[in-house]
């Protein structure tokens, strides 16, 4: 587990400790005691102004109607109604939301915002703690072995780099076939005799698929509506440097910098988080120095810049605010990737437009963090990898339970 730090143009704003290391006290007392000395600039009076939000959190799930009322409200309006100080909003809540739900509070559902703050920070003292994988990546260490096991034991076929381009259904609603397209070659294909489909896609993918699947969209209009929801652009950067640079906290958040252009950003010192496994970070090249991973969220303006402009902003304007030694480091290799519309946007009033777990078509189910799970609902109804995983299991169980497929 690692601590993290929050940075602004004024310097270090706050640090988040490893909450599990502190005395385990009833929430929110444990969190309050663990962070009482961690805010470097925010006065106590501003911190205390957030108390009204705790009352609203208790009210949130009193009934579905109350939840939808909060969902229709944007988070900034709620904060101001609760008389949270502007300084608390701008110096703490706004940066947290830009890297937690990837949008500023005025663009987020108040309901989803409260759930994020509750389940990640208040429900359990150590829920905000993050443990980093010791080497390589989650994809290499967890997902790839799982994929190989499913392929070997259950004859799963994984079509990497392949999009579902059209879902063909019969007039009775049965799934007939799925048309595909290779991202690399543009080659098209068809998967026939489809028993069931799990739509594990975001709003952008759903909208694109439904636009090409007229019969499916007509029989399941809730999917077409879901495809009209917004999504968030992300930019990911990895930098390999010619020297090692020590940073006090290997996980960091940037906020309010002009170079961010309205985005939220994080950076992680991978060589510190994966100490002892540096060679894996450098592949077949000799180890030279630090390796940095940085992500920008709400990054439409960042994505319009060239790769070099993004790297220069990190090396010249952002990273030196944390450690001046970055100004003297040279980038020996770099990777910049853009992911347009890749993250769910939980905008005000979006809950009823989000796709349901079980659709109007018996053989089509949905999975993902934005899916409404009905009677199987639990936990935060917003951005959450664990929720997406559990929703995938529930989607498969739904098909089995209703006899659509056999297992």
Role assignments for model-derived ranges:
Residues 98-101, 317-359:
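Flavin (FAD/FMN) cofactor-binding core of flavoprotein oxidoreductases
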Residues 157-159, 332-335, 365:
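General small-molecule cofactor/ligand-binding pocket signal
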Residues 372-399, 403:
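A conserved FAD-binding loop/helix module that cradles the flavin
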Residues 279-285, 340-378:
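FAD-binding beta-loop-beta segment adjacent to the flavin cofactor pocket
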Residues 133-134, 162-292, 297-303, 312-313, ...:
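Mid-domain catalytic core of redox enzymes
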Residues 150, 195, 396-406:
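Short, hydrophobic alpha-helical segments
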Residues 49-177, 181-184, 193:
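Active-site/ligand-binding neighborhood in enzyme catalytic cores
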Residues 1-56, 64-65:
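Dinucleotide-binding Rossmann-like beta1-alpha1 core, especially the glycine-rich loop
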